[in-house]
């Protein structure tokens, strides 16, 4: 059990315990900072179906073999009820993180890209942190949340050149701005405190009240609006302090038998941020691997380098997609037997000092056989002050 892990569940008293084991091979991955690395940890969960209370306590141990470094972090989460979904969470410890905290490249994809193609796209830094979050629905359709986080950040270097292929190419450095810079760091070691408040508004939301909770019913005639304000203060260097406001609009609508229409607009603006740490820039979810395992077509780009358009100013991000379902394909003899769905999309970034970056996509979803339809394929063309490039994106859904 020490090596393989252990799980115990008491359904009568409604609690469970899990230990992942020292050989948690499902977490095994590779990057050029840590080399081979894996996770272990413990988790305890307790729940009450009658009033919606839920508590979890988790710990994660991550060890990088080339770095010879153990990182430990923990999290406490408690949901008070199923009526307004009020919750509080506390977390802290040491972790290794991508510069883009949305983590646009997964551990699995980065492992394959690095070991087989020497494309080490994942760029990482270290942080020790402590964080508290609280949120609740204040009235029907309006959810408010806030958090305060302390971070002590440190840049990292590559610690291995191990690969499964043999050629003369060298790995890029761990600097997202200067991939051929192996001697200096993209930022100086520093600490900072950040406070954030946000709200999510679901216009026209209806609900059903039950003794065991509130069931929300979203009205697809209206968009969902999210607003946020963030302030960074108490930094090692005053230049790292800034203010930021952001907004996200999400909308999805089924248009009769003509398919599903979806869009997402994201906008934001930094203030007093001329010399902030690159960690705090707005980073866009790019992709240079031609593989997407996250099913996040409204939150990512297909051919965009990961940090080419990062900004500490203003930005507008646009994603539009229409899935025709069977509306077109079902009208084409023979092809209708495939049960594929035609999809078209448009994606754009607007940031100062750059021409708009755009992607136009067309592809097929629901590719596979029987109940196993896990593949999506898109043909992508990118434009910025003219045609930039083209490629094929493979989307995997498991």
Where do the PLM segments sit?
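Transmembrane beta-strand segments of outer-membrane beta-barrel domains in Gram-negative
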Residues: 1-34, 41, 104-255, 343-345
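Transmembrane beta-strand segments that form the barrel wall of outer-membrane beta-barrel proteins
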Residues: 17-30, 46, 52-78, 90, ...
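Residues that define the transmembrane beta-barrel architecture of outer-membrane proteins
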Residues: 34-38, 68-72, 126-130, 189-195, ...
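Repeated loop/turn-to-beta-strand initiation elements of outer-membrane beta-barrel proteins
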Residues: 48-55, 82-88, 141-144, 154, ...
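Transmembrane beta-barrel strands of outer-membrane/channel proteins
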Residues: 59-63, 76, 88-96, 146-152, ...
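Outer-membrane beta-barrel translocator domains and adjoining extracellular loop/strand segments
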Residues: 71-74, 101-106, 156-163, 210-215, ...
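C-terminal outer-membrane beta-barrel translocator/porin domains of Gram-negative envelope proteins
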Residues: 87-108, 112-123, 184-185, 217, ...
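Outer membrane beta-barrel transmembrane domains
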Residues: 161, 168-190, 278-370
